[in-house]
């Protein structure tokens, strides 16, 4: 006989009379006693992660939202009086704060912010919200960090109310008054609204619809808490970077609840992984059949919209206008998530068989052990305020870079870690704020090739051009906002990242290397033949000037740390405010990784052997020929940029190593930094280094910035480069992989 079950705050579960979802349930089985015990164990496992808020804190949130709601009502009455509405209308004019997102779903964590929507009647304008209501908030003692973002895609007021972060959207309905029992799911409310109000309403409408489409809200909430924690721990929780955001995870869990309406959380977590590890993407996930609504708004429909047919992992919002919440998902991010679903299924299989504990599901795999090759992106700005804006823009475009990388014929997977990290300062004496992202790469196996040359120049350059162009067009760009990119091997990451994120890594021979502050003299990226690419600011490089093709920065020629062999030189990513023509090649280890597994691999900790290391000094080019301006700058013939070269042995490769030597040195040998004068130098010409010094280059850059700081804010959003172009620098990140 099935055991009745009561979960936290829920009533006894009975077989549902109502049909949920677009298909019949897979199973109507009621929970067993073992399921109840596993669910209780799941709750106990979740508690230390802070996914449950204390009752006292929850009451505090309710109190704050009550104060905010009263402020809205008071403000709307004042607006109504100022617009001479009849007293009878003013007394019942209403106005209300609605919540959405994780708080409305009931799955918010400790310290999480609140997403809120201010709903006002038709006589209250958006301009009133961003003026008089903003001023009213400013007068409140509890309100701190008040800021308005009126020009955003979804305009918002952000604030901290008595220690709780709140984002408030605004929607004006075509109603004379706002009743207390207003149901925002009513499609007729969307009539005669402007698009910004429709967007603002969408969050509440979707959240409310989800809660009405699950059989048991308490079981849904506990399952969603577990899945969200799992996704965050496994670094696949980020809509902006091409993974899934909170609403998408909620819809996947809701669909699981529909398919197993009587199951409780322990079963639902397992069924979640079962369903979506076997889901035949790109078949869409739908919580209900889309309903026709004659409001002429664009909806997700691949039968009508050709672009919708290219969505890889569609999860469709249940409220009109239906949208795909996962349009950012790429081939790589879907591959990573599906692999994580499969691993989640394997672990929950073990848990249900009492072969593992729930804690195993929430163990964080070490991203920095999964791959042999990484691209590190660095964004820097001179002030903290500028850094926040710059980092936001760069992060929003990283998925474009991932999409470009995965189209490279030699790349199987480009996996960006959603976590960003503070980057070590380039110059400890200079005020600079730097943020770093890491992208793991898996290269395809190729047969009949000892060495594979992979050129990532075009992919990186297209990305940086896009970011700079948007920054200038949106009038956000400031001098000294920079992006740098470099290729790094797994064993070098300890020189860039905090030690706590690399704790699963074997100890390196790094005596004498200090992680913080980390300047160029303590960062040696050459021991594994890595290449770097540095992209200058778009306001620089307006005139012909000496080039520093090595891309090095102050401190480059200072003594290397103890970890490096004496014969190995530094090659690293820096931001150089001058146009460059830089092509680099390197030989690395084999790259036959499969899709990342949860299990970590031991890091290679052997220092490079000087006997097998071959050093070719970087060449700096003095007095280059003048570069054409305008669009011509982007059309300079360059045999490297954009060419997807086939694999071919390098003619001057060092003798083939034995298997033992290969294991120890394949990631350590042959440092090449090729730079060119019209790309015509031979290898023999590269064995010299000119006398141009970095200090001279920096002085030249400084003088150029001072004299060439011209307004770029009138750029139109067109593909062609403006007259004073964002420099399309033919820098190069090229890898030569030993087979």
UniProtKB/Swiss-Prot annotation:
Which protein family is named in the record? Belongs to the poly(A) polymerase family.
Mutation: residue 203 to H; reported impact is: Loss of enzyme activity. Strongly reduced affinity for RNA
Q: Where is the composition biased (Polar residues)?
A: 535-557, 595-604
Q: What is its main location?
A: nucleus
Q: Which PANTHER family match?
A: POLY A POLYMERASE (PTHR10682), POLY(A) POLYMERASE ALPHA (PTHR10682:SF9)
Query: Which EC numbers characterise this protein's activity in its record?
Result: 2.7.7.19
Q: Where does the record place the region Required for interaction with NUDT21? A: 671-739
- Give the modified residues of type N6-acetyllysine: 635, 644, 730, 734
Which residues fall in a compositionally biased region of kind Basic and acidic residues?
649-660, 676-686
Name of this protein: Poly(A) polymerase alpha
Catalytic function, reaction form: RNA(n) + ATP = RNA(n)-3'-adenine ribonucleotide + diphosphate
Question: Carries keyword Ubl conjugation?
Answer: yes
Q: Where is this region: Ser/Thr-rich?
A: 508-643
To which species is this protein native?
A: Bos taurus (Bovine)
Q: Where in the cell is it found?
A: Nucleus
The cross-references to CDD domains, in alphabetical order and at most eight, read:
NT_PAP_TUTase (cd05402)
Consequence of substituting residue 186 to H: Small decrease in non-specific and specific polyadenylation activity
For this chain, the Swiss-Prot or TrEMBL PTM comment says:
Polysumoylated. Varying sumoylation depending on tissue- and cell-type. Highly sumoylated in bladder and NIH 3T3 cells. Sumoylation is required for nuclear localization and enhances PAP stability. Desumoylated by SENP1. Inhibits polymerase activity.
For this chain the motif Nuclear localization signal 2 maps to 644-659
- A GO molecular-function descriptor: magnesium ion binding
Please give the annotated consequence of changing residue 208 to A: Reduces by 60% non-specific rf and specific polyadenylation activity
Instruction: Specify the cross-link site (Glycyl lysine isopeptide (Lys-Gly) (interchain with G-Cter in SUMO)).
Output: 444-445, 506-507, 730, 734
Keywords, in A-Z order: Acetylation, ATP-binding, Isopeptide bond, Magnesium, Manganese, Metal-binding, mRNA processing, Nucleotide-binding, Nucleus, Phosphoprotein, RNA-binding, Transferase, Ubl conjugation
Cofactor, how bound (note): Binds 2 magnesium ions. Also active with manganese.
Name the consequence of residue 208 to H.
Answer: Reduces by 20% non-specific and specific polyadenylation activity
Comp. bias regions, Low complexity: 1-17, 518-534, 583-594, 611-620, 688-700
């Amino acid at each position: 006989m099935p055991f009745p079950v009561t979960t936290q705050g829920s009533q006894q579960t009975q077989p549902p009379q109502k049909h949920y979802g677009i298909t019949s349930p897979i199973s109507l089985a009621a929970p067993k006693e073992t399921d109840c015990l596993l669910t209780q164990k799941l709750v106990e496992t979740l508690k230390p992660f802070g996914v449950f808020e204390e009752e006292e804190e929850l009451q505090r949130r309710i109190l704050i939202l009550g104060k905010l709601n009263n402020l809205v009502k008071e403000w709307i009455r004042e607006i109504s009086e100022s617009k001479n509405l009849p007293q009878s209308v003013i007394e019942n004019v209403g106005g209300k704060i609605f919540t959405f997102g994780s708080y409305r779903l009931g799955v918010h964590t400790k310290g999480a912010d609140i997403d809120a929507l201010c709903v006002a009647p038709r006589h209250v304008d958006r301009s009133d919200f961003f003026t008089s209501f903003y001023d009213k908030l400013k007068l409140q003692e509890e309100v701190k960090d008040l800021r308005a973002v009126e020009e955003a895609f979804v305009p918002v007021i952000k604030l901290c109310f008595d220690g709780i972060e709140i984002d408030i959207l605004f929607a004006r309905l075509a109603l004379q008054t706002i009743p207390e029992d207003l149901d925002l799911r009513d499609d007729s409310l969307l009539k005669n609204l402007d698009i910004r109000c429709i967007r603002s309403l969408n969050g509440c409408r979707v959240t409310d619809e989800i809660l009405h489409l699950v059989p048991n809200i308490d079981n849904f909430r506990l399952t969603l808490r577990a899945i969200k924690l799992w996704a965050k721990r496994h670094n696949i929780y980020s809509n902006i970077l091409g993974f899934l955001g909170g609403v998408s995870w909620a819809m996947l869990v809701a669909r699981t609840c529909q398919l197993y309406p009587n199951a409780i959380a322990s079963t639902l977590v397992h069924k979640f992984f079962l369903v979506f590890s076997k889901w035949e993407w790109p078949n869409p996930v739908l919580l209900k059949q889309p309903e026709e609504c004659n409001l002429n708004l664009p909806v997700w429909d691949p039968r009508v919209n050709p672009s919708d047919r290219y969505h890889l992992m569609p999860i469709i919002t249940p409220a009109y206008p239906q949208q795909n919440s996962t349009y950012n998902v790429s081939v790589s991010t879907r591959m990573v998530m599906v692999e994580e679903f499969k691993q989640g299924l394997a672990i929950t299989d073990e848990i249900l068989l009492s072969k593992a504990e729930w804690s195993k599901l929430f163990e964080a795999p070490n991203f920095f052990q999964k791959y042999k090759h990484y691209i590190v992106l660095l964004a820097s700005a001179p002030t903290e305020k500028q850094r926040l804006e710059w980092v936001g823009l760069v992060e929003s475009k990283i998925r474009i870079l991932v999409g470009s990388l995965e189209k490279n014929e030699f790349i199987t997977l480009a996996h960006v870690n959603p976590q960003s990290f503070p980057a070590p300062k380039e110059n400890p004496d200079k005020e600079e704020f730097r943020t770093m992202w890491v992208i793991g790469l898996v290269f395809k196996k190729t047969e009949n090739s000892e060495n594979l040359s992979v050129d990532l120049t075009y992919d990186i350059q297209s990305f940086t051009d896009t970011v700079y162009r948007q920054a200038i067009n949106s009038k956000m760009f400031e001098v000294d906002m920079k992006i740098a990119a470099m290729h790094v091997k797994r064993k070098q990451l300890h020189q860039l990242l905090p030690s706590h994120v690399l704790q699963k890594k074997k100890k390196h021979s790094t005596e004498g290397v200090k992680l913080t502050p980390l300047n160029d003299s303590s960062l040696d990226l050459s021991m594994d033949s890595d290449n770097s690419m540095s992209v200058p600011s778009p306001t620089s490089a307006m005139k012909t000037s000496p080039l520093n093709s090595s891309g090095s920065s102050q401190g480059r020629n200072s003594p290397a740390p103890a970890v490096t062999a004496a014969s190995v030189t530094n090659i690293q990513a820096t931001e150089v405010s001058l146009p460059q023509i830089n092509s680099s090649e390197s030989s690395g280890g084999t790259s036959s990784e499969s899709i990342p597994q949860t299990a970590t691999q031991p890091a290679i900790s052997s220092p490079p052997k000087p006997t097998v290391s071959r050093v070719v000094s970087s060449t700096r080019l003095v007095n280059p020929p003048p570069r054409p301006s305008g669009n011509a700058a982007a059309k300079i013939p360059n045999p490297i940029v954009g060419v997807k070269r086939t694999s071919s042995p390098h003619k001057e490769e060092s003798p083939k190593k034995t298997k033992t030597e290969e294991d120890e040195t394949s990631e350590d040998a042959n440092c090449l930094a090729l730079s060119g004068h019209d790309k015509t130098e031979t290898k023999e010409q590269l064995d010299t280094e000119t006398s141009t010094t970095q200090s001279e280059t920096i002085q030249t850059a400084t003088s150029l910035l001072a004299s060439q700081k011209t307004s770029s804010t009138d750029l139109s959003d067109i593909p062609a480069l403006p007259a004073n172009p964002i420099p399309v620098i033919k820098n190069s990140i090229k890898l030569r992989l030993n087979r």
